Amino acid sequence: MRAFGKTVLLGVTVVTALGISSIAFSQRLGKNLDEINQLANKEKNVRVATSWEPENEAALLKGFTQKYPGIKISTDRISGIDTRERIMNEALAGIVDHDLVNVSGELRNQYIKAGVLAGPIPWRNLFPKINERHFSPDGYFAASGFSTYIIAYNPTLVPKDKVPKSWNDCLDPYWKGKLVVLTRPRTFTGLAPGWGEEKTLAFARALKDNQPVWKSSQTGALTQVAVGEYPMICGMAYHSLKSTVQRDPTAKVAYAVPSDLPFQIGEAMGIMKGAKNPNAALALTGWLVTPEGQKNMDLEGRSSPYVPGTEAAELVKKHNAKIVFESWDALQHEAEMARKITGAWGFPKGKN
């Protein structure tokens, strides 16, 4: 695992479509799984830009390395928008260092429009037994990880009879001026496809009226809850809470699973056009979406709720929760919904 930090100066050079075409077909994708696997074994390498936790990688990828012992996986850890934009800009300049990239939701359409991705790929034909929600309708992405959002709290500060059971419990006057709400409203954009715009914005306004403590850092807010500065966070990513507990099992944090449980595509893998090892990248992605791969994604707290036996599926089952899924199509409207929610909170336009 390496931190991704290469900088490319593009200057004022205009990169044309011909500039990309020279690297676009340096390698070809196999026509079927047998051919893909044969070519993947010949490529022998795959380089991935991902947000996997370094300590989880060996166990996460164990099944793949056993199936493909001749393929070496190298990873670069990326986070946020900047590193992913850099990868896209480098590709436009003809530099393709990664075979497989976890592209964040805000940039997926940009990657497609820029022409830096291989595809469309017939994911659903290649992997007909995998739930179709794992594959984008346009054929450019496969979801290897999902994000779900829960309510985090400090069990020493929250009485048992006040442990929330639904999102509406965040509106209880008991929490007025006490609970934390994150300024990036991923929880509530995730609920919007199931709730509808009217209900989502009405809830956002009611939440604001409960005078929450606004925080921009999810990790920082959870640390403050753990040390007792605040009792609760109304909406945060389950995988972030899990990562905190893995690092410090004594952390005083617990979580409640609301009756409406939002799931979003948290890790969308795209194969880069001009990748040196596109078949190995496709083989790895195909393995990640299998039941075995998704069980291993439990380590990250990002498994699929649509694969029986995963942590995510058991979370839904145990708490009798209703899945609210933000589909690939709904993701296109997420930024607009985020602006409306933060507008209802009284934030300046563009803050989300």
Set out the residue ranges of the language-model regions.
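Early extracytoplasmic/lumenal segment of secretory-pathway proteins
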Residues: Q27-S104
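Short loop->beta-strand "edge-of-pocket" segments that line small-molecule binding or catalytic clefts
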Residues: E43-A49, N168-R186
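A structural signal for short loop-to-beta-strand junctions that line the ligand-binding cleft
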Residues: L92, V96-V103, V116-A152, N168
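Short beta-strand->loop
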Residues: A118-N125, G139-A142, V245-Q246, T250-F263, ...
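A bilobed periplasmic-binding-protein/Venus flytrap-type ligand-binding module shared by bacterial periplasmic
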Residues: A152-L157, A192-W195, I265-N277, N296-M297
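Periplasmic-binding protein-like
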Residues: W175-R184, T189, W287-E311
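Ligand-binding pocket segment of bilobal, Venus flytrap-like solute-binding proteins
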Residues: K178-V257
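Extracellular/periplasmic bilobal clamshell ligand-binding domains
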Residues: E311-N352
